[in-house]
Amino acid sequence: MNSIDKRLLDVLERYIASGIEQQVDYEKFYLYSLVTHSTAIEGSTITEVENQLLFDEGIVAKGRSINEQMMNVDLKNAYLYGFEWAQKMQLYTVDFLRQLSAMVMRRTGTKYSVVGGEFDSAQGDLRLCNVSAGVGGSS
C-alpha cells in the first residue's frame, strides 16, 4: 500500500470516527433533492431549502403557487410509497402503477375528455390520448 492509499484510509477512518455520517440523514437529503429536481423538470421553481421547510416544518414557500407546492408534496409521498413497496419485493402490476400514478397526481391531476373517452389523472387512470412535449411537440 502506498502513502496516498494510507493517507486516504486514515482520512476515511477519521471521518467515520467523527460521527458526521450519523448527523446527516442522507436518505432524506437524497429524497428531497430527487423531488426538487424531478419537479423542476415539470416547471416547479421550489428550491431544496424551500422543500425542506415544506416537508419538515409545514412552512410554505412565499411567492410559490399552491400547485407547485402540492406537486412536490405528492411526489415526495409517492416516492416514499414506492421505496416502501420496493422493500417488499412485490411484482409490478398495472394496478400498482395506477396507484402510484394517482399518488403523484393526487392534488395536481385533472379530468380529461378526449376522442378516446374520459380519464382522470388524479385517480391514476390510464391515458386515453397521446402525450406531447411542449406546444406542438411530437407524440
Can you say where each PLM-predicted feature lies in the sequence?
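FIC/Doc superfamily catalytic core
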Residues: 1-139
